[in-house]
Amino acid sequence: MQRSNARSRSNINSDMVDPPEVQTSPGNHRSSPSTAAKPKSKRTKSIIFVIVACVTIALGLLFIGYSILRSGRNRRVSLHYSVIIDGGSSGTRVHVFGYRIESGKPVFDFGEENYASLKLSPGLSAYADNPEGVSESVTELVEFAKKRVHKGKLKKSDIRLMATAGMRLLELPVQEQILDVTRRVLRSSGFDFRDEWASVISGSDEGVYAWVVANHALGSLGGEPLKTTGIVELGGASAQVTFVSTELVPSEFSRTLAYGNVSYNLYSHSFLDFGQDAAQEKLSESLYNSAANSTGEGIVPDPCIPKGYILETNLQKDLPGFLADKGKFTATLQAAGNFSECRSAAFAMLQEEKGKCTYKRCSIGSIFTPNLQGSFLATENFFHTSKFFGLGEKEWLSEMILAGKRFCGEEWSKLKVKYPTFKDENLLRYCFSSAYIISMLHDSLGVALDDERIKYASKAGEEDIPLDWALGAFILNTATATFDYSGKSRKILDLSNVAKYKI
């Protein structure tokens, strides 16, 4: 319409007046309508092309994202789940494991996608005076596990609670009261659960579980027995020693684990009360008792506490005999900070019951311990203390002595400046821990200070699998096996032709 109107006006005016001539410079030519439309058309096509390309790319990304989410969801749905709650002495940790079944065999993958854990403090044994109090922490751990298990798999996923040394120290009636509360929580969790799946496990079983996961991680499970790796654990309430021994081991310390055509004769024992925390408490009590037997009040030097630390503990202890009705014993704990004396005191404590030994050899107390054979991994507090001091992997026991001497002999005020983020109760442990480790491994078990066959570790293998006994328990409970325990066979593990491993 506009174009036609323009033409009519032009015709009328041409009859009356000749149009003026317009002079323009070469650079100021006006574009005709036809020439102006060409670049406009090109710009329009370019814009359309860009829009189409962006939409195509966006749709492609959406499709890829949807495919990934769908495949991830399908993988999660295809997973099977197992949950283990580790009732340790210092805290309670839940482990959530995901695994697949391929050709009727479980495939384990301890990567981040298929493994999660959460730890809460304190441990179950802290509720000895209030068993009902354990309900809250166990419930929180259960909720954590439920969020990591596909809803459709919840009822088919087993959940187990395995309590260790902290609970073993309690009287049996108290243990049962705490376990009954946990069973009530687990029954209503929605997971597959049976009452017998909440229990206090033996220290020997704990050691075997740790041995299994270590050798699984190292790829030696299924190989020659003498090429496997032993485990020495230093927990809070107990210490475990487990390894293949060629010696004749008394039945109470012997475990036979069958793996296909390979049979492993294991020595496994848990030294209850000889974990790091329990041992330090035991040593302090011994110092107090020595002072109580000699005087009514006084100063008790503790060589395992760094110099300059001020701690006044009024220990109200009934005196024995005729002094019992005369008063109470009040002692002041004084930091002596001497590594050598702390080491000697720890060694004396480890050897206290040696006079009662009825075996050909007892390394710790009256407990039979064969000569250590093969390579070993020292875990838990062996690892934590070594990392704290920044020890090297070679000759770390020799380095531990030097580090312990420096730490124990340092003034407390200087240690606080050097380690400002550490709480007092945590920082105080390392003087005793360094001396205790040497007195246990070197002085008692006979490990040479330069022996490179024993290394401290928290993970093992190319994939850095955590050296947590709960992972070994998961492997044993998921697969099917024959585990000979003191002459009695029970189904726990059969890894040959049953489970294949993908880590």
Curated annotation (Swiss-Prot):
Residues 1-39 are annotated as: Disordered. It catalyses: a ribonucleoside 5'-triphosphate + 2 H2O = a ribonucleoside 5'-phosphate + 2 phosphate + 2 H(+). Gene3D superfamilies: 3.30.420.40, Exopolyphosphatase. Domain 2. Residues 1-14 have a biased composition (Low complexity). It holds the Pfam family GDA1_CD39. Residues 67-503 are extracellular. Glycans are attached at N261, N293, N338. Its cofactor is Ca(2+). One of its GO terms (cellular component) is membrane. GO terms for molecular function: apyrase activity; ATP binding. Disruption phenotype: No visible phenotype. Residues 1-45 are cytoplasmic. The active site is at E206. Catalyzes the hydrolysis of phosphoanhydride bonds of nucleoside tri- and di-phosphates. Belongs to the GDA1/CD39 NTPase family. This is Probable apyrase 4. The lineage of its organism: Eukaryota, Viridiplantae, Streptophyta, Embryophyta, Tracheophyta. The gene is APY4.
